[in-house]
Amino acid sequence: MIFDVYSNYYSRHISRPSIGLGIGLVSSITSPIDFGFSASASAENTVKCSWYKETEQGFAKGLRLEYNDIYAMKPGDRIATYFHVYTEEDLNSANPVWYPMKAKILRIPVYEYSSTSPNAHITDVGSDYPIYAWIEHVDDEHR
């Protein structure tokens, strides 16, 4: 399953994810979902993002994408994201239930690579500059 990352509003905090899949709700999300993040040039590295997908259980809302070095991510890197399945009654819930999901970077557009990095790392960016990437769901067996 591929997730196409677009620009949105996000906040960040330092976090090194260590999570497993272990849920059945991911299978209900069967088509690509658009979501994304903007990041400022700082040491913070959890990105708060937002996407919605209607499922049989309600709406899946993904709100966090974590990476241990947002400015060094490159294709093949593992990241973690979380999603929450809403019913109509709890769309405005103050205490949503979060489900972890593993993912990996598939590719990042060349124009956002650093021209000085042999590993094509992402350059430092301003707070309004969107970082685009394509990520793929990864099961535990692909660790």
Swiss-Prot record:
Organism domain of life: Archaea
Name the chain's protein: Uncharacterized protein AF_0398
Q: Which organism is it from?
A: Archaeoglobus fulgidus (strain ATCC 49558 / DSM 4304 / JCM 9628 / NBRC 100126 / VC-16)
Please spell out the taxonomic lineage of the organism that makes this protein.
Archaea, Methanobacteriati, Methanobacteriota, Archaeoglobi, Archaeoglobales
